[in-house]
């Protein structure tokens, strides 16, 4: 007997019972995005490897350890996208969308990182992100945060997430801070783990988000980035905080929040939760005003965020189980039995779909008695059953049963659509 082939570790199948929940959540996310004026963009899953090396940074964990990179048949190095901000910027430059223009886009799709699989962290994961190009004020940063806050309210998780904010300033400000931080770390090398020692010179800001408790204790005495901010970055951050205060959005300033990708500047933010254990970040983003120029475009201010869909769905399931409890596949189930009923049922089903194109109507196939077919209707979550037997076929009628109340009546087929609207409204 042949050995079963299974999914690659860390890459998951999402079955119909799962995708019902995904679709319900995605519908809310997309509706809110449309309400803020965002349009969808779709970019390739595979990009040239230099795109990510230049955008994310050569000495980041993503580039050094986590990318799925290989040579294609022409010997060109290509990479499965580990994130999609770089792809959106590349597409914007390539198609002339960014110069002297304002763009608001969103994307949703699979990303790939070679990480140790665990709850909420996978090697193939779905990410929804939003990017804004051409706007540089703190007001657009605030709007992005307000957009995400609206998601949390609609999903019933707002009270279980916390907004963390920081400003990492300009490139020059970070260079000055980096020099001070390295000098501090050099004095305390004996208290650093090997990973932090490696990062101390290559990417010292990443030491700030070390998960090592001893390192975190040491950092209590380290220089703080806020003391090195340039005047414009400080004004921008103060403006953002004032806007959020005015909008009633609570936040916590986290001086050690730096984000793991090199392209960020000024505003960085994360929505975090304690409800999922170690994997606490739900959504994260910030400004990346230099990235467009870095990838070959003209200087263009930009800001955005990304959110892991699997982690969001885990959080909604944990906090708001009622939201994901309903798994209705069909509104109406068409049961048929007896001679001639199958053909009549096919015709009736198409007529109803023509009249009510938004209706979810599932037709019984495979026979079965009346009781068994109604059992299938219940399993699919149907509220109404249409019953078509030999008598109904001969008379041109249909029995319609409200599965919630048990009430049943027989009507001419021409009146069925109107009655369904009444019962389901």
From Swiss-Prot:
GO cellular component, one term: cytoplasm
Any GO BP: histidyl-tRNA aminoacylation
Localization annotation: Cytoplasm
Pfam name, any one: HGTP_anticodon
Keywords: Aminoacyl-tRNA synthetase, ATP-binding, Cytoplasm, Ligase, Nucleotide-binding, Protein biosynthesis
EC number, as in UniProt: 6.1.1.21
Alphabetical list of SUPFAM superfamilies matching this protein: Class II aaRS ABD-related, Class II aaRS and biotin synthetases
Catalytic activity: tRNA(His) + L-histidine + ATP = L-histidyl-tRNA(His) + AMP + diphosphate + H(+)
GO molecular function per UniProt: ATP binding; histidine-tRNA ligase activity
Assembly: Homodimer.
PANTHER family named among the record's database cross-references: HISTIDINE--TRNA LIGASE, MITOCHONDRIAL-RELATED, HISTIDYL-TRNA SYNTHETASE
Family stated for the protein in its record: Belongs to the class-II aminoacyl-tRNA synthetase family.
The protein, known as: Histidine--tRNA ligase
Name of the gene this protein is made from: hisS
């Amino acid at each position: 007997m042949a050995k079963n082939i299974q999914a690659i570790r860390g890459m998951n199948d999402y079955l119909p019972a799962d995708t019902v929940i995904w679709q319900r959540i995605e519908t809310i996310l997309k509706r809110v995005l449309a309400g803020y004026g965002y349009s969808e963009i779709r970019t390739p899953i595979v990009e040239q490897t230099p795109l990510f090396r230049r955008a994310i940074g050569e000495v980041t964990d993503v580039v050094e350890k986590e990318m799925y990179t290989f040579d294609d048949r022409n010997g060109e190095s290509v990479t499965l996208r580990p994130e999609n901000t770089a792809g959106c910027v590349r597409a914007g430059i390539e198609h002339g969308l960014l110069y002297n223009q304002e763009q608001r886009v969103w994307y949703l799709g699979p990303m790939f990182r070679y990480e140790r699989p665990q709850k909420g962290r996978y090697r193939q994961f779905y990410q929804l992100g939003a990017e804004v190009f051409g706007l540089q004020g703190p007001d657009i940063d605030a709007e992005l945060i307000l957009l995400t806050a609206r998601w949390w309210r609609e999903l019933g998780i707002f009270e279980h997430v916390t907004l963390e904010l920081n400003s990492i300033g300009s490139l020059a400000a970070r260079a000055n801070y980096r020099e001070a931080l390295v000098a501090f770390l050099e004095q305390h090398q004996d208290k650093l783990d090997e990973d932090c020692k490696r990062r101390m010179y290559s990417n010292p800001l990443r030491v700030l988000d070390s998960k090592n408790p001893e390192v975190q204790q040491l950092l209590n005495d380290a220089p703080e980035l806020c003391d090195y901010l340039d005047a414009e970055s400080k004004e921008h951050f103060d403006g953002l905080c004032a806007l959020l205060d005015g909008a009633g959005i609570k936040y916590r300033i986290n001086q050690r929040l730096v984000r793991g990708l090199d392209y960020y500047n000024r505003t960085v933010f994360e929505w975090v939760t304690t409800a999922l254990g170690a994997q606490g970040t739900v959504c994260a983003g910030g400004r990346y005003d230099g990235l467009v120029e870095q990838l070959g475009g003209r200087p263009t201010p930009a800001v955005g965020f990304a959110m892991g869909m699997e982690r969001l769905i885990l959080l909604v399931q944990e906090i708001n189980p009622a939201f994901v409890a309903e798994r209705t596949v069909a509104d109406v189930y068409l049961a048929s039995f007896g001679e001639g009923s199958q053909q009549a049922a096919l015709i009736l089903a198409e007529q109803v779909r023509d009249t009510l194109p938004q209706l979810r109507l599932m037709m019984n196939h495979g026979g079965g008695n009346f009781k068994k077919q109604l059992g299938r209707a219940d399993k699919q979550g149907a509220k109404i059953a249409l019953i078509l037997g030999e008598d109904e076929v001969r008379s041109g009628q249909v029995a319609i049963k409200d599965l919630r109340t048990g009430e049943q009546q027989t009507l001419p087929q021409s009146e069925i659509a109107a009655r369904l609207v009444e019962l389901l409204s």
